[in-house]
């Protein structure tokens, strides 16, 4: 990632394409086989599981139930002398981590879900991105260095220690499922693994036209020289689809589906093309889902998105679609079982746009917007000019404002 004030080239192309593309469509590829979810969807916000962590309108961190009840303050001193950013829950425990700047300096802060067991691990610079390892024992951190580049540092919670593992700008990474190493895409052309001792192994050629790789149980997904590629265990590479331009993609946790959009300037022919090699050619300026096992491609919407986020069960995709009326609003849509439905429209909070949506392919791996049971999701923004934290259920019902605030993330359990 890169924290330069300019919008990334991919996002700039997305904005251009969005202004010239047609409105979204819920059409899907012919012959699609849908898989029905086995868990009934919750329709009442009060019945949703897990906890939310919010940065409230005073800048403090608070956890609460999904309906806003049972709030637990984590910090209470935000202001001129203390600032807190991007709190998230561990994937395996009731533990929080966040970036902080206080009178004691910059640090990675941590506590349990109710503010107990507080600790602060000093850092040389404030983290602007944090990504828990799947086992919850560590966090990969990105922050700026004194040399003007980005440093990648791993925090070991048990030892309360940190170690710089790499540097470069931009810097994107993805944890291996066993938490033993990361796959990194650095300075556009470096593609390598980095283990917990800092040892680097080159993964070979990679393309420039993407940001974050994604390591899933199936292997490492990245943009190769021939298209969207899955590098499997043992080094074998499989091209899933060819792409007409730069891409952003997110893979579900199971590694079975990839949501992809390829951004190109100018008009592109609609639809999905099949190459002679039977490798599908993805359309430009559209969002599609690729089934990893079968290679089938399903069209989600026929215009670019500002953000894509998979549900924990891997069956539903949250699509944040720009509304082309000059209002700055987005449509929160859900693709599920081959169908797209609009859940709400809202104006996303500026912090969410600047910090998350610019890099949604990276945050899609670390930020939990969905409830643990995949029945709902939470967003920070304004609905009908009412700002706050809004919880949505995908089975129906109006979104519910549960708190004031600028940031929200859901626990994993």
Question: Regions from the language model: what does each represent?
Answer:
Residues 1-17:
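Sec-dependent bacterial lipoprotein signal peptides
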């Amino acid at each position: 990632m890169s924290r330069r004030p300019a919008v990334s080239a991919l996002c700039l192309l997305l904005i251009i394409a969005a202004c010239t593309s047609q409105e979204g469509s819920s059409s899907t590829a012919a012959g699609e086989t849908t898989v029905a979810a086995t868990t009934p969807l919750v329709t009442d916000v009060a019945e949703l599981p897990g906890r939310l962590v919010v940065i409230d309108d005073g800048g403090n961190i608070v956890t609460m139930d999904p309906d806003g009840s049972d709030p637990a303050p984590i910090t209470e001193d935000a202001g001129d002398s203390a600032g807190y950013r991007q709190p998230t829950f561990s994937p395996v425990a009731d533990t929080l981590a966040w970036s902080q700047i206080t009178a004691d300096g910059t640090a990675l802060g941590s506590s349990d879900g109710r503010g107990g067991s507080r600790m602060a691990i000093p850092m040389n610079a404030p983290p602007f991105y944090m990504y828990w390892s799947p086992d919850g024992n560590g966090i990969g951190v990105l922050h700026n260095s004194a040399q003007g580049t980005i440093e990648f540092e791993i925090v070991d919670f048990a030892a309360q220690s940190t170690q710089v593992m790499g540097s470069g700008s931009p810097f994107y990474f993805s944890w291996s499922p066993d938490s033993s190493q990361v796959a990194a895409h650095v300075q556009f052309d470096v593609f390598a693994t980095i283990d917990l001792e800092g040892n680097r192994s080159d993964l070979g050629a990679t393309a420039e036209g993407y940001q974050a790789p994604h390591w899933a149980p199936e292997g490492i997904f990245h943009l190769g020289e021939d298209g969207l590629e899955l590098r499997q265990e043992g080094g074998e590479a499989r091209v899933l689809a060819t792409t007409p331009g730069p891409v952003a993609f997110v893979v579900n946790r199971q590694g079975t589906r990839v949501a992809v959009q390829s951004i190109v300037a100018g008009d592109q022919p609609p639809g999905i093309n099949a190459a002679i090699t039977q490798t599908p050619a993805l359309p430009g300026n559209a969002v599609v889902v690729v089934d990893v096992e079968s290679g089938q491609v399903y069209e989600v919407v026929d215009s670019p998105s500002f953000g894509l986020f998979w549900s924990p069960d891997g069956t539903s995709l949250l699509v944040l679609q720009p509304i082309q009326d000059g209002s700055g609003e987005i449509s929160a849509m859900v693709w599920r079982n081959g169908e797209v439905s609009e859940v709400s429209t809202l104006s996303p909070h500026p912090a969410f746009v600047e910090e998350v949506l610019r890099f949604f392919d990276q945050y899609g791996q670390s930020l939990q917007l969905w409830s643990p049971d995949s029945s709902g999701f939470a967003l920070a923004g304004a609905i009908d000019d009412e700002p706050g934290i809004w919880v949505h259920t995908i089975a129906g019902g109006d979104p519910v404002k549960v708190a004031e605030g600028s940031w929200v993330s859901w626990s994993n359990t």
